[in-house]
Amino acid sequence: MYWRSDEWQEEIYPACEQLSLPEGLLISQNTSFGSQFISRSIFQQKCYKHSVPMLNTNNGLMLNKFAGLLPIAEQTWHDFTGNSSKGSFAYSVVPVLYSISISAVITWFLNIFVITNYTIKPSILLRASTTLSSIYLLITVIMAIIELHKQQKQGFLHGTKLFDCINSSLALNIIDLIVVFLLQINQVQIIMRIFSRQKDKRLTFFVGIFASITSQVLWAITRFHSFSDDSEAGDILPAFQYLVRIAMGVCYAALVSVFVLMKINYIIANKKIWLITLLTVILIYGPVAFFIADVSNAWVFELSEIFSVVTYDICVVIPWEWCNKYNSIMKAKEKEGVLGRKFYEDELYELDRFELFVDEEDEDHENNNNENDDESGNENDNERGNNDHNNRHGLSRNGENTHKGYRPVNFDGNDKGFGSIFETYRRTKETFLNITDHVIAKGLAIPRSASVFTGTPVSAHNDEVFRMDNLNHKRDDPADMTLENQEDHRNTNRNNTIRFASNSDIHRTNNSTAQNRRDVFVYSTREVIIDASDTET
């Protein structure tokens, strides 16, 4: 970042410069190198980037009993640890190693929790992202141990050198790029779960994917591209990328918080989700708090990528489990109620696209009226049919008014070119929405309502008709009826008709939507009246 550089800009400490030593006895820990008496020598202590002293681990018997540190080296170490922020305890090896280990343990625990969740199977994306984050932290721990082992063999330990080893690893940077992108998509997945309308889910999907790709592309440019010292892009892009991540974290936390506040009455009524709701509200602000700490604290910046993965992992797994708990409570509530779940106007129009609300008797009247040359009879029948249709399909017409774009448009013979263009546009749009719904339903495991459909409508003229004779408690034997009663009985059966989509149409519907979802639509063409005696009513 342009406001904070990870490079050491401090002056060279005196102990890190070349020191002229007087005559004396030179003793080496190497057994092949014998002790020698020298009259003059030049000594240079091992320092980080030849400017900052490091912790000496050669505390043997010779150093403790017979010889001590050089006075200038001892004074330099005292100044470095007492007056420099880089020499504080936070930058030593122990806090760094503990921070990495704790982050790895948290990530592994969340991964095990997701994989072993037997109540509601998590999505493939969630399992993949948590598994990759665990692998990322595992590789980080292994690299840290190897680097500390190398430093120990050289006789020095330094936390900042460990920072450089982790941050400069190409393999870790590539894995971090993939893991953070998947975790950001998981956040989009959780936001989609709190919306009920399919249109809102699609909009969230497109906006979230675009924001995630933009954020990670900017991060990749700032991480893998080397900017010159006088390049303005090297100062602007890191700051802008950081602002994008902060904005995404704030939007995610705000949307989840608003949804929790809207459903606070249901949450208060169910004590089982109090704890996980509190954890969700607190932990979703983890990335925001981390970004603030990252800007204000240079030590957090050194481990920013590791902490970023952990905070993303936490604010994804916990809200996902909260959504599972909340959805199970709402499903139980809907089962206890009479009305079930809510239907929206776009869903009502989706149902009407199948022409399942069209009455067969009205269709017969319409066909007969077209063939009849009597204008007065046609006007009366059409007026009666239109009144019946308006009474039964008021709701579906409201959906039609709000979704006129789905209705087929008829063009004249001179406008065949426009008709083909419009038909191509319609089919392309349906295919695109169908693919999007498949990705949402399968890849992101977002359940959708059974009435949402993006394929070609099924024609009502190809439907099979079944008589629901068993709906009436009292059925007279047709053999015992007169001709007039039998005719009334047939008319009653015609009115009590349930229409099902044919097997081929259901198969096409299943292929165009989700394979694991049963798309069975049952609607009555007329109001079904169950015969009952006066005493029973």
UniProtKB/Swiss-Prot annotation:
GO terms under biological process: cellular response to pH
The keyword Cell membrane belongs to this UniProt entry's keyword annotation: yes
Transmembrane segment boundaries: 95-115, 128-148, 165-185, 204-224, 248-268, 273-293, 298-318
Keywords: Cell membrane, Membrane, Transmembrane, Transmembrane helix
Disordered, as annotated region: 362-410, 472-495
Cell location: Cell membrane
Cytoplasmic side: 116-127, 186-203, 269-272, 319-537
InterPro entries in the record: PalH
Pfam family membership, one: PalH
GO CC list: plasma membrane
Topology, Extracellular side: 1-94, 149-164, 225-247, 294-297
UniProt membrane topology term: Multi-pass membrane protein
Composition skew (Acidic residues), residue ranges: 362-380
Residue spans of biased composition, Basic and acidic residues class: 381-391
Chain's role: Required for the proteolytic cleavage of the transcription factor RIM101 in response to alkaline ambient pH.
PANTHER family found in the cross-reference section: PH-RESPONSE REGULATOR PROTEIN PALH/RIM21 (PTHR35779), PH-RESPONSE REGULATOR PROTEIN PALH_RIM21 (PTHR35779:SF1)
Family under the similarity heading: Belongs to the palH/RIM21 family.
Protein's name according to its UniProt entry: pH-response regulator protein palH/RIM21
Protein's organism: Debaryomyces hansenii (strain ATCC 36239 / CBS 767 / BCRC 21394 / JCM 1990 / NBRC 0083 / IGC 2968) (Yeast)
